[in-house]
């Protein structure tokens, strides 16, 4: 893990003891055999793990904060959910096509999921880092988002726009280069070819 921001409570959920570079470690018992589903549960259902917290920032394990998290939390003053704009995909259709092209999920599952979504032109964000206020509406959004992942593919960027639209939530999609910006650096995943 990259160094934790010392100005906020930084928590790492893990199923085994690891060196965390300043993070508070919460050892959890695995609930799912698929580690992707496991990590997405903590990512999506943040309101369940941080019930007495006004807001939270999720960052994937391959992300490094380049600014204090207070700079990022400032984005939440006017909206309840913030993430970077997707670097290549503009719409849900673009995301679905890329998922199929890169074999990130079975084509049939992606097609079935897209058939379930009435609007394919929804804007898409990248969810490698995600800021949320813990409002009742955002908690309901999180639950619906998790439900989509239990019914359809595990591709969270595919299901989130549908849920945002369903709850009439307009996220703030920050216009930054996901891989080269002054806020959060996204590094290549280790051990992934």
Language model feature labels by segment:
Residues 1-193:
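Glycosyltransferase catalytic domains, chiefly GT-A lineage
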């Amino acid at each position: 893990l990259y160094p934790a921001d010392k100005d906020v409570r930084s928590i790492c959920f893990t199923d085994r003891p690891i060196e965390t570079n300043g993070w508070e470690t919460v050892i959890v018992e695995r609930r799912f055999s698929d580690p992707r589903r496991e990590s997405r549960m903590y990512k999506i259902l943040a309101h369940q793990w941080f019930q007495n917290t006004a807001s939270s920032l999720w960052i994937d394990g391959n992300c490094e904060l380049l600014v204090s998290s207070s700079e990022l939390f400032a984005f939440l003053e006017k909206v309840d959910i913030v993430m970077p704009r997707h670097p290549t995909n503009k719409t849900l259709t673009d995301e679905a096509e890329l998922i199929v092209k890169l074999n990130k999920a079975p084509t049939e599952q992606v097609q079935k999921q897209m058939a379930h979504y009435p609007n394919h032109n929804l804007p898409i964000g990248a969810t490698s880092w995600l800021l949320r206020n813990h409002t009742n509406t955002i908690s309901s959004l999180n639950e619906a988002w998790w439900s989509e992942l239990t019914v359809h593919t595990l591709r969270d960027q595919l299901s989130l726009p549908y849920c945002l639209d369903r709850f009439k939530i307009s996220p703030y999609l920050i216009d930054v280069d996901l891989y080269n910006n002054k806020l959060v650096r996204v590094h290549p995943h280790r051990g992934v070819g």
